[in-house]
Design a protein with these regions (language model features):
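Extended, compositionally biased alpha-helical segments that mediate assembly or anchoring
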Residues: 659-741
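Second-shell loop/turn segments in exported
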Residues: 66-71, 132-136, 209, 314
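Catalytic-core regions of glycoside hydrolase
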Residues: 42, 92, 98-107, 126-130, ...
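C-terminal motif of bacterial Sec signal peptides marking the signal peptidase cleavage site
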Residues: 15-17
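Contiguous, structured surface segment used for ligand recognition
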Residues: 19-120
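Sec-dependent signal peptide recognition
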Residues: 2-9
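C-terminal substrate/ligand-recognition segments
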Residues: 525-545, 557-580
Length: 741
């Protein structure tokens, strides 16, 4: 064969092979993701399908000007792309859509071939609560960005519970309930997760018909895209929660009241249908059948029948019988069904579950391969270690990390590393996955990215300091000594302690001079376990960094607001002490500084899109099709992040946020009214009347969300770097005096 002819045939063969690879459905899905995420690089990226499905893996290799990404499916290829972005482009694709990906002008080469393999087959993400604290107002554009983020981070088992009320509406209608009975049974949109988990009914309802249709169509888009990217959406199943008026149709239905939850009155209490009755299986089949018609299925369903609730009986035999009946009803509707269940209940009500073999009886009463458990809070309380690794039932190690979407710098990189590795070492063959069950997106995205990198055999994740150094480079877009110094400080302080419920600074707390239990501040945890001077030093390094990335701006704003928030929390203790000791000169001095902080925090937050209450409200209103609906959605959006129900509710402040607009018109307003009343009492020589203040401020809190007080910017305003420099200079002397040791 002549040489030119041979070369021609070889090139033709390569072109045919490349063409076949690019037409593979997995490569087609990945090509679409590449075009969305890195369109400027797309023409120089070649995708190839690896012919193995036994384990997820990817390869990266540069050939000339081309980057070759190989993977056994689109999800693995997406992880490969993200690895390239992080470790060669020094760039981060953020879960915050507004934080744009910043890429080098010249596409970097991969000097040596990279090959990584998934250590676990299942990578789970989300929490029922996330759909209330973060996602209730999302449109398709936001979901599309987030699904790409999930794919890039290797998530292949996402919770997918959007739009289920549309399914239930049809089921209940066919069973004879009226439109009013059904829609008034649902809660308001942001509170739906707790309705779905059998915690509350009715509050904030009835749901508009437009909401049901909007969410149904949105869910179709969500699950279609997730499946394109090799994910298995976890759809909801029937847990036994029924409208109380179902007894109008079925007067003999065996219903139990699940009773009080978080102080909501009896009109909001949920009714639970006994899984042992025939009606339970009938409803399960109706729901699953209709859900599959609407959204398709990957045969995995989330069902939690006793979340934060007490079962009708604690007898092990009853618990085993009930769980078996639930599974059998699911299998009757879908013979290939797997039941996914969170195990938060085993920790939250551990005083009941951890006796008489109740957990074992409950989770082992049907085939283990048909059950999948989420070990919900492993960074703090890994239940697998308390239950003989769940007695052989498959489970996923999960990092929770956040409660209520609170804005508190917090994390525990070293502990997460150690505990994940312990699960690999001692967790048994039924340890099948790594995931995260965060309640809301927060200001610590690095923790979740780290957790999902641990699902792959990247040796760098075992060296936390080295991983953090690479993270700093990604935040800077290059190697920067100042950025590295900042993140080393943060990793050694902020990101070295476990999170806890309700973490927030005192700014976000309703002011009180007395017992926080008396004035419903149960979920406020303003304590921090590091020296606040570390934040000032980290801020100085960030401001000195030689880069101008969006990620650096976010870090500067994030750290500055936490620095001031911690200082405010410490000053609050000084203020209360001065009042009790009648040291009014000291009190007024402290009050002046606290007021100054309140005035400085909001403009700082306003410079960063991730910290704007205006975005939250804008997105809520955008779903409405009438002014009435827009106002309804806005009020509901305001409520969940403030009183979480009626005024002075038990969950008040549980979902507090460090957001511009909210800080000025809600948090700062309360503090300034508090200072005014205390000052007036001192001037008059009488005790501060906290009860009167409390009643007045609770009324204002209700007005803030019901009457939709004030309008807010939905776009960032101002120069965060300049404001941070001014703040550092303004408070430096007193911060140094207080914290430098």
């Amino acid at each position: 064969m002549k040489k030119p002819h041979f070369i021609f045939i070889l090139c033709l063969a390569l072109c045919v092979a490349c063409s076949k690879t690019e037409t593979d459905p997995e490569c087609v899905a990945m090509r679409a993701l590449v075009n969305r995420v890195v369109p400027e690089y797309s023409k120089n990226i070649v995708l190839e399908r690896l012919e193995t499905d036994s384990v997820d893996r990817f390869e990266l290799e540069s050939k000339g000007k081309k980057l070759i990404i190989r993977g056994n499916n689109a999800n693995s290829m997406a992880v490969g792309l993200n690895h390239y972005l992080k470790y060669y482009c020094l760039a981060q694709y953020s879960w915050f859509k507004e934080e744009a990906l910043e890429l080098p002008a010249v596409m970097p080469k991969v000097p040596e071939k990279v090959s990584l393999t998934a250590r676990v087959p299942e990578r789970f993400f989300l929490n029922y609560c996330t759909f209330g604290y973060t996602m209730p107002w999302w449109n398709w554009e936001q979901w599309e960005h987030f699904i790409d983020w999930m794919a890039l981070n290797g998530i292949n088992l996402p919770l997918a519970i959007t739009g289920q009320e549309a399914v239930w509406y049809e089921v209940w209608s066919e069973m004879g309930l009226t439109d009013e009975e059904i829609r008034s049974y649902f809660t308001g949109p942001a509170h739906l997760p707790w309705h779905r988990m059998q915690n509350i009914d009715r509050w904030g309802g009835p749901l508009p018909v437009s909401w049901l249709e909007n969410q149904k169509e949105l869910q179709k888009q969500i699950v279609a895209r997730e499946r394109e990217l090799n994910m298995k959406p976890v759809l909801p199943g029937f847990a036994g929660h029924v409208p109380p008026c179902i007894t109008r149709i079925y007067p003999d239905a065996p219903l139990a009241s699940l009773g009080d939850w978080a102080g909501f009155d009896s009109t909001c209490w949920c009714k639970f249908l006994d899984p042992e009755c025939e009606l339970y299986a009938e409803i399960q089949k109706k729901f699953i059948t209709k859900e599959i018609e609407m959204f398709g299925t990957d045969h995995i369903y989330g069902i939690d029948i006793f979340n934060e609730m007490i079962p009708p009986s604690w007898e092990p035999e009853y618990l085993g019988r009930v769980s078996r009946q639930v599974y059998e009803s699911l299998a009757a509707a879908d013979p290939d069904a797997r039941w996914l269940e969170m195990t938060w209940l085993f920790w939250n009500e551990r005083q009941y579950w951890e006796v008489d073999n109740r957990i074992e009886a409950y989770i082992t009463s049907f085939p283990k391969e048909r059950h999948l458990l989420l070990d919900y809070y492993c960074e703090r309380q890994p239940v697998w270690e308390r239950t003989n690794a769940y007695y052989g039932v498959p489970y996923i190690w999960c990092y929770l990390g956040n409660f209520g979407g609170n804005s508190m710098l917090a994390g525990n990189l070293d502990t997460v590393n150690v505990r994940i590795e312990r699960a690999f070492e001692k967790g048994g063959d039924n340890f099948v996955g790594i995931g995260s069950t965060l309640e809301g997106f927060d200001c610590n995205p690095l923790m979740y990215e780290y957790v999902f990198e641990k699902a792959w055999d990247n040796p760098l994740t075992n060296d936390v300091p080295a991983w953090v150094e690479h993270l700093a480079d990604q935040r800077a877009g290059k190697e920067d000594v100042e950025m590295r110094a900042a993140w080393k400080l943060l990793a050694d302080s902020v990101y070295n302690k476990v999170s806890s419920p309700g973490q927030t600074v005192r700014i976000n707390q309703r002011p009180t001079m007395g017992d926080i239990q008396e004035y419903h501040q149960y979920y406020i945890a303003p304590t921090y376990r590091y020296n606040n001077i570390d934040l000032l030093d980290a801020l100085d390094h960030l401001l000195a960094a030689d880069c101008n990335t969006r990620t650096r701006h976010f870090d500067v704003v994030n750290i500055t607001r936490q620095l001031l928030g911690n200082y405010f929390s410490d000053l609050y203790a000084d203020y209360v002490k001065a009042y009790r000791e009648a040291d009014y000169e000291k009190l007024h001095q402290v009050e002046k500084t606290m007021t100054s902080i309140l005035d400085d925090v909001d403009p700082m937050l306003a410079t960063e899109s991730a910290f704007l209450v205006g975005r939250w409200i804008r997105d809520a209103r955008a779903i409405g099709t009438t002014e009435e609906d827009k106002d309804y959605f806005e009020s509901n959006a305001r409520n969940i992040i403030t009183t979480w129900g009626e005024e002075d509710a038990l969950l008040n402040e549980y979902a507090s946020r460090a957001w511009a607009g909210l800080t000025e018109t809600y948090y700062a307003y309360r503090w300034k009214e508090f200072f005014k009343d205390v000052d007036a009492a001192i001037e008059a020589g009488v005790p501060f009347d906290e009860k009167a203040y409390h009643e007045r401020i609770c009324k204002y809190e209700g007005q803030w969300w019901r009457d939709r007080l004030s309008n807010f910017n939905a776009e960032p305003q101002g120069d965060g770097l300049a404001l941070a420099r001014n703040i550092a200079d303004k408070y430096r002397r007193e911060l140094e005096e207080r914290y430098r040791k």
